[in-house]
């Protein structure tokens, strides 16, 4: 009888946790413990059970909703496009990150998928101009530190740019810059559509010891007016696939010492 009552209380509590996630993008263990008057161990067990049931995704110190959408920079209104490819790219890219790294993280939906995995590492600091990414880390990743670059807000796009952003980038240094091109054009390099974003991306690469470009196959020979980097300016490129071997061919044509590594996710 006591076991049945305990189970009923647990079911009610877990239903209430799911209601919390309906109103917020994330929930923390400490918040659950305080709200329901249970221990942290019990709160974690509730989240683990809900995760095993496929109702939420566990993070370090809490959980996030599988259904509630975050507001993402509208420079790329494709949060629900090529999701599997972006997640595969992120999973491969996380292998380039070591415990204790400082990362410069670009704006974009693939960058957000990458950031979602940072709780797999310890002692990470993220430097970014993307407000959505900073919000996500603040709400869902208590173990990850975040530094916001200053600047002017590009309205409707949720990222910062301009002279203050550029000045801030001259004052920081990262182990890895994680870049998300708007497009890759074989004869040009990595591009974006907004000139001030191009200069920000260029400065991010310059401020890091190494850099990686994350892009799904749709970006190959796509459209982009402003180049922010040549192929050889990055150290690694991570893709879900390389259409017509366009990127591999461009790499083969580069000088040996300057060739970036190409990683095909899942290959």
Protein language model annotation of sequence segments:
Residues 2-30, 37, 52, 85, ...:
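Conserved phosphate- and dinucleotide-binding cores of soluble alpha/beta proteins
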Residues 2-104, 115-123, 138-143:
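HTH-adjacent hinge/linker in prokaryotic transcriptional regulators
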Residues 109-112:
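Gly/Ser/Thr-rich loops at beta-strand to alpha-helix junctions
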């Amino acid at each position: 009888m006591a076991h049945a009552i305990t189970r009923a209380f647990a079911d009610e509590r877990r239903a209430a946790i799911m209601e919390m996630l309906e109103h917020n993008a994330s929930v923390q263990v400490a918040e659950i413990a305080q709200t329901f008057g249970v221990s942290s161990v019990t709160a974690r067990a509730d989240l683990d059970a809900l995760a095993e049931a496929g109702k939420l995704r566990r993070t370090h110190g809490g959980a996030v909703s599988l259904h509630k959408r975050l507001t993402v920079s509208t420079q790329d209104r494709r949060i629900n496009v090529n999701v599997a490819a972006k997640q595969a790219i992120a999973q491969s890219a996380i292998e380039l990150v070591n415990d204790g790294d400082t990362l410069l993280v670009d704006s974009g939906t693939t960058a957000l998928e990458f950031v979602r995995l940072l709780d797999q590492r310890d002692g990470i600091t993220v430097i970014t101009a993307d407000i959505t990414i900073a919000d996500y880390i603040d709400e869902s990743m208590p173990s990850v530190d975040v530094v916001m670059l200053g600047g002017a807000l590009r309205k409707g796009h949720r990222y910062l740019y301009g002279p203050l952003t550029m000045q801030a980038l001259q004052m920081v240094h990262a182990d890895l810059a994680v870049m998300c091109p708007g497009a890759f054009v074989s004869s040009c390099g990595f591009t974006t559509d907004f000139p001030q974003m191009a200069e920000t991306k260029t400065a991010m690469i310059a401020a890091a010891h190494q850099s990686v470009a994350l892009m799904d196959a749709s970006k190959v020979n796509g459209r982009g007016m402003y180049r922010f980097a040549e192929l050889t300016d990055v150290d690694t490129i991570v893709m879900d696939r390389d259409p017509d071997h366009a990127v591999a061919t461009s790499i083969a044509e580069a000088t040996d010492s300057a060739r970036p590594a190409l990683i095909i996710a899942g290959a």
